[in-house]
Structure formats: C-alpha cells, structure tokens
A protein has these predicted regions:
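Catalytic binding pocket for nucleotide-activated donors in carbohydrate/polymer assembly enzymes
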Residues: 18-19, 136-229
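Nucleotide-activated donor-binding/catalytic signature segment of Leloir-type glycosyltransferases, i.e.
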Residues: 94, 99-136, 193
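A structural motif in glycosyltransferase catalytic domains
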Residues: 68, 83-86, 98, 241
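C-terminal alpha-helical cap of glycosyltransferases
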Residues: 234-252
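Single conserved hydrophobic/aromatic residue that forms the stacking wall/gate
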Residues: 1-10
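Conserved donor-binding/catalytic core segment of Leloir-type glycosyltransferases
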Residues: 62-77
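A conserved mid-protein helix/loop that constitutes part of the nucleotide-sugar donor-binding site
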Residues: 75-88
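Glycine-rich phosphate/pyrophosphate-binding loop
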Residues: 13-65, 196, 200-216, 222-225
Length: 252
C-alpha cells in the first residue's frame, strides 16, 4: 500500500506558475515609467517610452532600431555565457540596441562594460539594480532577452509581456510554459523561443525577431497585443491552487 501511494504521489504532480502583482506592474498607472499605456494605445505609449529611455541611457533615439532589454542576475544559469559568445557578432552586424541592468559574476559584468565602451551607440549597461530603471526597461524596450539554462518559473518574462515587450526566451521550465512561440503562418504567439542551449541558435532567434520587428509591423503589434492580454496575475494562480485543493479534498 505504501508503494502504491508513493507511485501515485510521483505520478500526480501539478505545476502552478507564479503570479505577478498586477497592481505593482501596471502600464496604465506605473509611477516609474514615462508614459502610461494599455493594450489599445500601446503603439504611441511604447514609442514615447522608448525614446525617453534611449535619451536617458545616452543611446541614439532611433524608433526603427530594435531596443532589447535585459534585467537579470548575471550568472551562467541565466544564460550569460551564450550572450557573451555572440555579443560582438550581434552588435557588429545588426541594427540593434541593448539596455542592460543587473549584477552578478565579474566576468559578465566586465563583458558588458567592455561592449558598452566598444559600441557606445548600441549598448548601455547599468551594473547594479534600480527598481525605477527596471520598470522603465520593461515598459520601453521592444524585446526582452531571457536565455536561461534553466528557469523553474521566472517573473521577468511575465513583466515584459505585461508591458508589451516581446520576450525572446529559451524553451525551458516556466519560460516554455508562459511564452508561446510566434508562428508567422498562423499569426499566433506572444514571443520568440529557441530549444537548444546554443549561442548561435539564440543569435538566429534574435535575428528572426529583428526581421519581424523591421518588416512585419502588423505581426509585431499582434505579438505585443496578445502578450498584454495574457493573465498571469496572482488571482489566476490563486484560482489554480484553489482548484487543486478542491481536487485533493475530493480524492480523500
């Protein structure tokens, strides 16, 4: 009987995603961001936020250059070995800008400092943490990069979706569960993803995202709108916990 019970415990496991505080992270009333917006008027709202952030960071104000955000601990677990491997090629060959915020391992902090000096018009890295700067990156960037080696749930991709910033993620853990890959034929999805923990696969995905941003504005705006309509609030997560407790009670 004990063995049967153990087998049932192993078999009947349920995953419930973290929730996001939709009061704190609300593009319609966030006190940290430059301009408020919602899923109806995001085109103008994000345009204004992007220009203000570019100016604040000392980057050239370019509406049609993709601005990619990174807010993270700078560790290998978060995929920064992949980022380090392709950073020079990405910045040298693509019309792209990066806004980086975080702290972590010295090798990655130094890497971002180096590239910020080498490509001052393309990358600005803040080594440290600022709640205000984090909110502004989520609200102002076009895309958000999160190439984690593993990620049990993750919150940054939920924040980026909430603010209409299209996530580019590796298909692992909670990232795979929360970001639906863009399908150019069915015009579905909320972001871009790559399966293998491989730097050039990540680079190819970033380049694909840049091409959609540049050449398929209708599809890009669809990604933003679908992402903003997702519900990853604590109310949703709490409802799933409640349903699971009810199921367990019925089982007993």
């Amino acid at each position: 009987l004990g063995l049967v019970g153990s087998e049932m415990c192993i078999r009947d496991r349920y995953g419930i995603l973290n929730g996001l505080d939709y009061e704190e992270y609300d593009p319609q009333k966030d006190g940290y961001i430059y301009n408020h917006f919602n899923e109806q008027n995001f085109q103008e709202g994000k345009k204004l936020n992007k220009a203000r952030l570019q100016k604040e960071l000392g980057l050239p104000v370019k509406e049609n250059t993709m601005l990619i955000g990174i807010v993270s601990r700078m560790t290998s677990q978060k995929g920064f070995d992949l980022v380090a491997y392709i950073m020079d090629e990405l910045l040298a060959t693509e019309d792209v800008q990066l806004a980086v915020l975080g702290t972590g391992e010295d090798q990655y902090q130094d890497m971002f400092r180096y590239f910020a000096q080498k490509y001052p018009d393309k990358i600005q890295a803040t080594i440290g943490y600022s709640e205000e700067r984090a909110h502004r990156i989520y609200a102002s960037c076009d895309a958000f990069l999160m190439p984690s080696l593993f990620e049990p749930c993750g919150l940054s991709q939920l924040m980026s979706l909430r603010y209409g910033t299209v996530p580019i993620v590796r298909e692992t853990g909670g990232l795979k569960d929360t970001v639906e890959a863009y399908n150019e034929y069915e015009h579905t999805g909320t972001g871009f993803s790559f399966a293998n923990y491989n730097a050039h696969e990540m680079l190819g995905t970033i380049r694909y995202a840049i091409s959609v941003f540049r050449d398929r504005k209708k599809d890009w705006n669809g990604l933003i709108q679908r992402g903003m309509k997702q519900d990853f609030s604590w109310n949703r997560s709490a409802g799933k916990y409640e349903a699971l407790y009810e199921k367990l009670t019925d089982f007993e």
